[in-house]
Amino acid sequence: MCDDTLLNKQYSRVNELAKKQYSGNEHGLVNGICLVNMLWTREDEIIPVDYRVYRKESDDKTKNDHFQDMLKRAKDRGFLPFYVLMDSWYSSIDNLKLIARKFKWDFICNLKSNRKVSVYQGTYIPIADLDLAEKQVRKVWLKEFGFILVCKIVDKDGDITYLATNDLTLLHYDDFIAHFQHRWKIEEFHRGIKQTTGIEKCYSTLASVNNGVEFPIFSGLDFPTPL
């Protein structure tokens, strides 16, 4: 699974790795460092696999480029995931094709409500307009990709999350949701590294110092290869 987190550096007035960016926790712009993480879960274990520091202004790669690089490295190291889990930020067509076509892996991801799907050949509609009942799993054609299964989660406030998978055998709604719920383990991981490593409390301003102090703490978690 992959997701990014913001290392809050709001009290560091100058930091070469930090920039103003939106924080979901703060519900606004915060000065921070964007860290993109990839994890492997095995039962109740949460195992870090890889990470990247994303710097929008000076990075020659997007977060999606980093995501693909980490996937390729995981593939080269012998990982065989049951599912690759990610949110809508990482569910671009290029990413889905890399996972499903090149690596022959299955994915479960969020889709934004405006992603185009088709029930009838040649007719595309936003997934938000799809006739999709609660707890229904439906087979549709995702534009520029191919057949997928989709379902939706409706929370207590009525907000809707759309999920998609290329595993056309995942027809039972409860199984679909149960597999995707593993993605929340990356949120546990992000909270854990912030609380236990002090990674947000390093106020070095130079990128070279940050890389030398903060991320060896992170990489000290000893990224494994699968057994």
Model-derived features: positions:
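Active-site-proximal, Lys/Arg-enriched surface segment
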Residues: 1-44
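Single, function-defining residue in the core of a domain
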Residues: 9-14, 44-227
